[in-house]
A protein has these predicted regions:
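Glycine- and acidic/polar-rich repeat regions and solenoidal domains
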Residues: 125-126, 177
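Active-site-adjacent "subsite" loops/lids of carbohydrate-active enzymes
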Residues: 18-99, 108, 165-187
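Histidine/acidic-residue-rich catalytic or RNA/ligand-binding cores of hydrolases
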Residues: 48-54, 112-120, 154, 158-169
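Short, small-residue-rich loop/turn micro-motifs
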Residues: 6, 106-111
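Aromatic-lined substrate-binding rim segments of carbohydrate-active enzymes
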Residues: 9-37, 120-125, 134-135, 141
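Catalytic domains of carbohydrate-active enzymes, especially glycoside hydrolases
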Residues: 1-7, 95-101
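Aromatic-lined carbohydrate-recognition surfaces of secreted/lumenal glycan-active proteins
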Residues: 31, 35-50, 106, 131-162
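Active-site-proximal beta-alpha loop/turn segments in soluble metabolic enzymes
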Residues: 10-12, 67-76, 114-124
């Protein structure tokens, strides 16, 4: 199994015909070798334009800190129009390329959002639930298509095949030699 990341030049949200055809050819090559292939998407803490961001209940502006309501920094609200487009692009990628592995970093389970203009929720009180439903529906779609999922443990009952055991983001800020010990503990 190969999970490509943006560090390798992988761009799961790139919907240009030439890129998708290149990824389709790569998938065919991998499949001929008996290798499942797919990629990674950073969803949490990726940044967002103000109109797409999870809006703080405390400030009325995009949430950037835990005090403002964000778990991992400036993140998009996946119940916004941006979120709808994001999932359309992902579905198009998998449908067009035939790749069958997906690792998603987020949404943990989505920062609450006070926006009243996002198309996928009414306001603060329903925002996290609507985001949960949107991403859970996507994961269920993936599983119905046979796509292997490595996603946060909040979604294990929504179709995840694997979830990191003992994963803590701060582990990867440690010196490399400590990271190796942690990696081996998680195996």
């Amino acid at each position: 199994m190969v999970i490509m990341t943006f560090g390798s030049g992988f761009q799961i949200e790139n919907d240009s015909v030439s890129y998708l055809q290149r990824m389709k050819a790569l998938n065919s090559y991998a499949a001929d070798k008996g290798i499942a292939i797919g990629g990674y998407s950073l969803l949490a803490s990726r940044g967002a334009k103000p109109k797409d961001a999870a809006i703080s209940h405390h400030t009325g502006y995009p949430a950037k800190t835990r005090e403002e309501g964000s778990r991992f920094g400036l993140s998009p609200c996946i119940a916004s129009d941006w979120g709808s487009d994001y999932f359309k692009r992902l579905k198009n990628f998998f449908h067009t390329t035939g790749m069958n592995v997906f690792e998603n970093d987020g949404s943990y389970p989505g920062d609450p959002c006070s926006s009243t203009v996002h198309s996928g929720h009414k306001g603060y009180l329903d925002s996290q639930w609507k985001q949960w439903n949107r991403i859970s529906s996507f994961y269920q779609w993936c599983r119905a298509k046979g796509i292997y999922l490595n996603v946060p443990d909040w979604y294990f009952l929504m179709g995840s095949n694997k979830t990191p055991m003992g994963y803590v983001e701060t582990n990867w800020s440690l010196p490399r030699s400590y990271q190796e010990v942690i990696e081996r503990q998680n195996i």
